[in-house]
Amino acid sequence: MAKEAQSLHELDNMKEKEVDQEKKAPTSVGDQEEHDDPKKQASHSQNVSENGLVDEAAQEAPEDESQYPGPLAMAVIMVAISMGMFLVSLLPLGRFYKFYSPKWVYMSLVFIFVIGSAVGAGAMNSNTVIVGRAIQGIGLGGVLSGSTILIAENAPLHRQPMFLGILMATMSISAIVGPLIGGALTTHTSWRWCFILNIPIGGAIIAVLFFFVKAREGKEQRAQGWVEKIRQLDPLGSALLLPAVVCLILALQWAGSQYSWDNWRIILLFVFGGLLSIGFVVSQMLRPDTATVPPHVVCQRTVFGSFLFSAMTGGAMLVVTYWISDWFQAVQNVSAAQAGIRTIALVLSQAVGAIMGGGSSRLIGYPPPIMMISATFIAVGAGLLTTLNVDTKSANWIGYQILMGLGLGFGTQQASLAVQTVLKKDDIPTAISLIFFGMQLGGSIFVCIGQNVFNQVFVKLLGQAAIPGLDTDLVLRTGATEIRQLVHNDADLSKLVTTYNTSVTSTFYVALAAGITSMLSAFLVQWKSVKNVEPVH
């Protein structure tokens, strides 16, 4: 491994020299380590651990923009990759966790992630990096839900809050550590090490699971032959659900920004999305025994309430995480790195909230009241974030983030605990996968809604500001750190920054709505204690 890494590094250095000699723009990933694209830095602080590593590396690897796919093609690529990660992985993998040993399924997913890391480490062009990241996404998509499932398999319910709190706190802390490690590796060695480092870590995880986790017998013996085994995994349901959600996401992303709401493209996307969704629901009802989302599971009151709660909190989290960084860069005029540092309050408070939520669950025993506290903090935090302006003091925006982070941390594990109090053990893997699917789905939908709100408000207010010579489309295409370069006097700059501030804070109303809805969903969850729960038959 050391020799391979050294060879990769030498190859990188050789290519850098060729670039200097020929004075050409970089055309492949290997040629890009000495360059920096500020647009790609805008969201690096929003990613956790591994995402932080690779995104930090991506800042050092720009290409000639003429070589990128067009807007439509790029939208389809990114939606396919991101949606494929959590749709193809989360829900169908819940079936794997149900019918096969969670230990071996989890180890296989980690191995797939390692393969993707190896592909990314050896990439000679950006297309190969995309392939590597997609493979990583498939493996990583089932790891989070799988971690919770493994805890459910190996710990009694009354002890799980402590372990889940540690798990969620670790995720929050990794959001800080990941980009820092990625930046250090990219600056002092090579971006390839952001991929290479995952390989020994993944190997260590597999070794620990192999030697220390007891494998539970799966239910694969119920299925006779490959046809029956494949049928158990519900390929029809997955084939209907994936394009349905992609259509919905694209419609929400494009409507009101690229196209009007009555444009035929938007209408067609909603129609196709609706028809595919109906087809998915029908397929689940006709084959309940092999359904990806069994009706008897999702229609259970606590499961449905927990799914909705997870979707709302996930949506609020991604909206705030996405836009608070933009606010720091555009309104407070700081770099992407400084914006990342200023969101530490949000991330650390999530970690503290996760630990406190775990302790509270073990002490109180009932998830619903903690979910209500979580929703209250989220709603209050998001509401306060809507008051941000150009002159907001640091004590205020730090305090607002802490309230938001505590709310997110408090509620992050409660849905997974609640469903275990009402379901049979065989249905728990499916329910937990459904919970994490809801979190990812809610995040994707609400980010699109937030983007739409931002665009609508920004276009309207910028038109009212009447800044001479300023093109609205150009501003929307410009990174948050660069918008100040588009105007040339203080009066116009003040108008532009004020417009941007109002547009960003308008997106926090979306998070506020999600927080209020999560409060309502918590009332659906039954008050059943996690202490000494009798198995459900």
From Swiss-Prot:
Compartments where found: Cell membrane
Any one GO CC term of the record: plasma membrane
Keywords associated with the record: Cell membrane, Glycoprotein, Membrane, Transmembrane, Transmembrane helix, Transport
Glycosylation sites: N47, N333, N501
Family statement: Belongs to the major facilitator superfamily. TCR/Tet family.
Known role: Efflux pump; part of the gene cluster that mediates the biosynthesis of ustilaginoidins, dimeric gamma-naphthopyrones isolated from different fungal species.
Name of the protein this chain belongs to: Efflux pump ustT
Recorded name of the encoding gene: ustT
